[in-house]
């Protein structure tokens, strides 16, 4: 549901954006924590819906998990200031602060709440959860991180994100595991450079915005809906392009940020980490291709329940973004010359 005609939702959406600005522009850890709390309290009214039991359950689960993460974060920064009197690097404290922020963004191994909550949300709320809600924890993580701990987290993210999405029938759960997988890539991008993280994050947000807009228009929440709906060839082609781009298959736009990260990994001789990350991407591409293949192959069946007709303006809009996904990689080659 979009919030253009609901003043209450628009107000909380504004507070949500404003709270992120408070956190990322604060010059103290306590100010960052206040921003995180305002962010939590503004997102709950957006996702709670008295008419939808799953949404109400998701808002309660979100509140509990984020509260635990906030308490851990506050406890860690207070303990650091009391015991150490400064913010020099300390392994135990840095791991505690990193763990709290990773739990905030739904990273593995603190990801157990993430797919369950995404299952109860609308596509628009899922988009906010998987993009905007990750900005503050990521920027705070970039200020103070434990390198060895984050390498372990990256491996967990890419593996759990890939394997967890294999047996899913819900599109929302599948996209949440895909988000966990991409989180591993984003954490490494953040460790290399904040600019590279921002570039990866922008590309990822662009790709999933197309996918979520697509699912919102077609009112799709489960994989079997792709088979029972009578979609024309152009809609299926657009779906295929965007799925493959999200998976990071060349020559689509989604491959570009992964290519840059693989390049950095190979230069720094992280061969095992490169192998694990590339193999995990192959697994995610496998479950995307499985959906696309079924969607195309089941076309001969006449047992279609719903005929989908998108108006020309919406179709042109989707076609434009799919074209950007195809041409983005070709145009990006000019950036290096």
Model-derived features: positions:
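Core, highly hydrophobic multi-pass alpha-helical transmembrane subunits of bioenergetic inner membranes
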Residues: 1-337
């Amino acid at each position: 549901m979009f919030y253009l005609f609901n003043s209450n939702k628009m107000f909380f959406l504004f507070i949500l954006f404003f709270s992120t600005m408070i956190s990322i522009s604060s010059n103290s850890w306590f100010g960052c924590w206040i921003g995180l709390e305002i962010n939590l309290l503004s997102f709950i009214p957006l996702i709670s819906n008295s008419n939808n039991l799953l949404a109400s359950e998701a808002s309660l689960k979100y509140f509990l998990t984020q509260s635990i993460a906030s308490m851990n974060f506050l406890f860690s920064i207070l303990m650091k200031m009391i015991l150490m009197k400064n913010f020099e690097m300390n392994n135990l404290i840095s791991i505690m602060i990193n763990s709290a922020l990773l739990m905030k963004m739904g990273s593995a191994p603190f990801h157990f709440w993430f797919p369950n909550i995404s299952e109860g949300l609308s596509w628009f709320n899922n988009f906010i959860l998987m993009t905007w809600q990750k900005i503050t924890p990521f920027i705070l993580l970039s200020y103070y991180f434990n390198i060895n701990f984050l390498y372990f987290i990256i491996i967990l993210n890419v593996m759990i994100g890939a394997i967890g999405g294999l047996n899913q029938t819900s599109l929302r759960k599948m996209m949440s595991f895909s988000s966990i997988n991409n989180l591993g890539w984003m954490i490494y991008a953040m460790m290399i450079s904040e600019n590279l993280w921002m570039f990866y994050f922008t590309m990822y947000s662009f790709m999933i915005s197309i996918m979520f807009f697509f699912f919102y228009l077609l009112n799709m929440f489960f994989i079997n809906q792709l088979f029972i709906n009578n979609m024309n060839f152009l809609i299926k082609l657009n779906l295929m392009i965007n799925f493959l781009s999200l998976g990071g298959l060349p020559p689509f736009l989604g491959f570009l940020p992964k290519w840059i990260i693989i390049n950095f990994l190979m230069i720094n001789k992280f061969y095992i980490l490169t192998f694990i990350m590339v193999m995990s991407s192959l697994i995610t591409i496998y479950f995307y291709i499985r959906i696309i293949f079924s969607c195309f192959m089941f076309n001969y069946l006449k047992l279609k329940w719903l005929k989908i007709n998108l108006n020309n303006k919406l179709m042109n809009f989707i076609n434009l973004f799919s074209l950007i996904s195809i041409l983005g990689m070709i145009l990006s080659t000019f950036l290096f010359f």
